[in-house]
Amino acid sequence: MIRKIIKALWIFLAVIVLAIVIVFVSISKGWIGYMPPVEELENPSYKFATEIFSEDEKVLGTWSYSKENRVYTAYKDLSPSIINALIATEDVRFVEHSGIDAKALFRAFVKRGLMFQKNAGGGSTLSQQLAKQLFTENVARNTLQRLFQKPIEWVIAVKLERYYTKEEILSMYLNKFDFLNNAVGIKTAAYTYFGCEPKDLKIEEAATLVGMCKNPSLYNPVRFNERSRGRRNVVLEQMRKAGYITDAECDSLQALPLKLTYNRVDHKEGLATYFREYLRGVMTAPKPVRSDYRGWQMQKFYEDSIAWETNPLYGWCAKNKKKDGTNYNIYTDGLKIYTTINSRMQQYAEDAVKEHLGDYLQPIFFKEKEGSKNAPYARSLPEKRVEELLTKAMKQTERYRLMKEAGASEQQIRKAFDTPEEMTVFSWKGDKDTIMTPMDSIRYYKSFLRTGFMSMDPANGHVKAYVGGPNYVYFQYDMAMVGRRQVGSTIKPYLYTLAMENGFSPCDQARHVEQTLIDENGTPWTPRNANDKRYGEMVTLKWGLANSDNWISAYLMGKLNPYDLVRLIHSFGVRNKAIDPVVSLCLGPCEISVGEMVSAYTAFANKGIRVAPLFVTRIEDSDGNVISTFAPQMEEVISASSTYKMLVMLRAVINEGTGGRVRRYGITADMGGKTGTTNDNSDAWFMGFTPSLVSGCLVGGDERDIHFGRMTYGQGAAAALPIWAMYMKKVYDDPTLGYDQQERFKLPEGFDPCAGSETPDGEVIEEGGLDDLFN
């Protein structure tokens, strides 16, 4: 009887062993479940975010899909603390086993399978956990499914150990794990929770992150600080048991509070948000096809077509192929994009915008509109027109679109927009919670002044700073490169350049009186002037530009051809085809972007050579191989002699004219510039340049009818110039950037900007004028 029992047990055991062998062979061959092929095991599919770097190699941000914001980190870049904490907590015999820890597996089987102890710990090794993350996409929903899934993980874990070193497995695990809050992978997690690189993680910080590996939602340190701290202390205790830290270290670290340096990873936040979004749009642009554009988008089709042919960065993803023949994907291919943005200069630009626009100008604008039924629109605008504009804005909202699609009537929609509700809104002092109607929120957001700012190196086109608006989260329309506004008097340097190219000089004179020209319709046109000082006197062209005098501009326009002026403006890199060749063009009614203006003004600082904005210097793949480089694009647009004459006059704008306010900010540098203000103070401009930097700034409302009522605050010298000056002062005050206020423009020896001019005896050359220009 006993022999029969023993024989039966042996047969039963043999059947079990045979069944196990058959199961594992079947799994290994792929007959049961999914077994990845060798190629997939050797090269598991990872989706890595693209990193955008500044020129000083600071990470500006990343591009990724929402659940794949992962940045690759090599083993050598990991802190020993994170490795020790992970091994001590998750797989203490990691270096000893080959994918399956028999001791841990047996312990788990006995305590959990036979004794039903839920807190007995698991038997999964790090290799098995990695196998689960990499190749078992369908998570088991019950115990039975888990029983079938476990053997598959065991086989994959053994194969992973065969193909990879222990260090590679640890690195893969930490790169793959999702630490929540859009922090996938150890590099993003280290920055998100502690504001540092993985190699700089302290022991207690590493323990916090490893503690999340058990259950990231349960031990989320942002939501559950104390619970996460408790889990961190468990990890520290495991490190003590494993001998990685001493008893004293463990006790002192466990006593520490859990302190986070939380940095929310969001493409809408951080430094240079408008720049990053503009760059993303440029790189992912498809090849322009006319049928994809509506009738009113022909200007965009024209610009996109030129960019596709001339700009290697435009449509980069569509133009470049990977080794497997597919196009690059900026969201998953782990690219490294090295931009021309300087992180400190970018910060200075954003700080200047906040200090002047947010802290000073915006409160004044709010106060001016206080009590006005038309607010934020001009008081002179009819109430009916204000209502039309607000209704139009309402119909452009996502709320309106969704309600319309749901079948709501106009009356129902309007009622919803007039019903107060809780909401979080933007303010320059930080987001604030309030209660207002959606309609009032439209008025509220339209009350904020917008801005565009760009700064670039005239020698190579490197864009150093780029600000497209007050806050990208709430104001996503880019006023730096995308939006175009009327330029006002900042167009006058183009007019004067055309005059210099046609033989005029800064010392040529005109009588300072009203000028009447015949416009394209045969109608007399007489521009208004800001003032009548020196009325009836003979004044130089230099005086006319320095004082932004409309009569002298009209005088020159009468001597020149508006068609030639349009051609010259286009030659300066302006691509707006809707610039009409009319006599009033000399006062700047046309619309140009800040980026186009900055690029155009580089010609004045660069001996007549205009340089296009350069945003990226090189792109590397995930392995660090350089796959694209980018060079400056330059073009001579005016002669060097005309450039020197323009330098004389544009410098006078600062030293003697409308741009003199710059000097109040401690800017002593040799520079030229031009202010600009459009009708009703709708747009305020300042363009300024030194030998090493060309920068431009625009300030205006969301619409042309939203503006200051008084020129005191709405003119270019008051609204835009201070941002430029504050930025430059910060740049000059930072010696590490290498910009020097002692730098001077260089003229050819013996150059006479007034050669050939018939300035009569007795003409007064303004103080600080031609004779001592470059001393």
Feature-to-residue mapping (PLM):
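N-terminal type II signal-anchor transmembrane helix
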Residues: M1-F53, G113, Y360
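Peptidoglycan glycan-strand catalytic modules in the bacterial/periplasmic cell-wall system
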Residues: Y46-A49, F53-W308, C317, D324-T326, ...
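Active-site SXXK
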Residues: A85-I87, M239, A349, N460-G461, ...
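Short, well-structured active-site flanking segments
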Residues: V95-L105, V184-K187, T246-D251, M500-N521, ...
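Non-catalytic structural connector segments
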Residues: K118, T246-T340, R344-A408
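Active-site-adjacent helix/loop patches that line small-molecule binding or acyl-intermediate pockets
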Residues: T125-L126, L134-T136, N142, R146, ...
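Short, glycine/proline-biased beta-turn/loop segments that scaffold the active-site neighborhood
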Residues: P257, V482-M538, A612-I627
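A penicillin-recognizing enzyme superfamily signal
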Residues: T339, S343-D359, L390-D457, H462, ...
